[in-house]
Amino acid sequence: MTASHSLALSMTKSTSPLILTLTLSLQPPLKHPRKRETFQEIQAYPNAEVISLSPKSLMATNRFFCEICNKGFQREQNLQLHKRGHNLPWKLKQKTNKNQVKKKVYICPEKSCVHHDPARALGDLTGIKKHFSRKHGEKKWKCDKCSKKYAVISDWKAHNKICGSREFRCDCGTLFSRKDSFISHRSFCDVLAEESSKFFSVPSPLAANSTIATVTDTNNPILIQSQLDQSSTGTADLNVNNNHTTLFGQKFTNSNPTQQQPNALALSSPPSPRSTSDSVHNLWKLQEEECAHQWLLNEYMNNNKNIFHKGIFKNQEDEIKKGNIYSGSNPTDGNIASLFSYNQEAVNMASFSATTLLQKVAQTGTPSSSETSTTMFGQMTSSIFNNTMLNSYCLTAKNNEEELTRDFLGVGSSEDQQRLHRHRFPSSVPLTANHDIPKLAATIVGRKQP
């Protein structure tokens, strides 16, 4: 006898209800079979008769027919009752304890189905019919509201009763009739939306480009539109309004020197190796697009000289003569530099490629025609030439219409170009109208011309 049993016997001698309660609690709990095991025990019929019906006979509406009128019945009992009307001998099956009827189970006629195994057979003829229709049959019944199809008419009727009464709509537009399905889908949809927002929130380094759009003046608004192929050349914005100039996503403000902000390059933080490599890659992409934009603007200004108002760049011209725009503390210098690079070190890393391009210019010689100038302009992507030409287009203008359009290098014969050259190349030779392009390129790269 175990210790637990002896404890129980000693406690039963007392009549105290508390001790009796303790005695009952010490009894070992009864083990109840799990639902899965109970289901398997019910479905398992070791002595049952296994019946295999063909798909045709299984899906037949009537399996029993009258010999006289050929009327069909689904059950044999109904046929026997029908025979009484024809005065035929009929007999109903009666249950007796003497002759025990074997249980009948039905297997699925589809060999690949799990219920084709006799151990997984279904014990109801109606159940095997519905199973075969749902899993292997044709769905003939369609809901008029949600267009769902069903193979069993009872399922279709049950669906019609609740269809449209309860709807759970997700933000993505999906409808659910069950709340659990909606909750599981919503959790997945929220995670997907969060990841998508993180992806699209990353700013693109080339996002500052848009269509060459507007040149506005206070008195004479002029709209210039140029249709560009956005997939190949990108877009750019040029907005001039009084003392504010916006070019290719960068804003320049011409104000007094006392109101100027610190240089953008001076405020930039030291770059990391990864950001420096990205800056070099984005530098050349921006320069290639900039060349295309400036060439288009040049061509458009040559063809439409008369549409520009002569006083549209007056403020910029006055500032050039005063020497404010190209002063060392002007934020325009930093803004123009930041247009082509994120910091000064990125420009220095790209100097090797610029030197190679300048050597090509020195070898090819001076362009002799406008076509050659256009070709040479497309080849030169150095930030030196791009910045020079950018300033000549956007920050200078003359009363003479012929001087509105600068050459592609921006090295005109005006005194403003001399100031521009001294600002950009303080240690180089002075720039004059008689300078040759190969000599200029050779001077920059340190090559001596014969």
UniProtKB/Swiss-Prot annotation:
Instruction: Enumerate the UniProt keywords alphabetically.
Output: DNA-binding, Metal-binding, Nucleus, Phosphoprotein, Repeat, Transcription, Transcription regulation, Zinc, Zinc-finger
Under SMART domains, the record lists: ZnF_C2H2
Query: Which Pfam families does the UniProt entry name for this protein?
Result: C2CH-3rd_BIRD-IDD, C2CH-4th_BIRD-IDD, C2H2-2nd_BIRD-IDD, zf-met
UniProt-annotated stretches for the region SHR-binding: 178-190
UniProt motif (Nuclear localization signal) ranges: 128-135
Q: Which InterPro entries match?
A: C2CH-3rd_BIRD-IDD, C2CH-4th_BIRD-IDD, C2H2-2nd_BIRD-IDD, IDD1-16, Znf_C2H2_sf, Znf_C2H2_type
Extract one GO molecular function annotation from the record.
Answer: zinc ion binding
Can you tell which superkingdom this protein's organism belongs to?
A: Eukaryota
Q: Which GO terms describe its biological process?
A: regulation of DNA-templated transcription
Enumerate the residue ranges forming zinc fingers (CCHC-type).
Answer: 168-191
List GO terms (cellular component aspect). nucleus
Give positions of region: Disordered: 248-280
This protein's record includes keyword Magnesium: no
Q: Where does Zn(2+) 1 bind?
A: 143, 146, 159, 163
Subcellular location field: Nucleus
Q: Which residue stretches does the UniProt record annotate as biased composition, category Polar residues?
A: 248-263
Q: Does the keyword Nucleus apply?
A: yes
Looking up PANTHER family in the UniProt record yields: PROTEIN INDETERMINATE-DOMAIN 13-RELATED (PTHR10593:SF231), SERINE/THREONINE-PROTEIN KINASE RIO (PTHR10593)
The protein's job, in short, is: Probable transcription factor.
Which protein, by its recorded name, is this? Protein indeterminate-domain 13
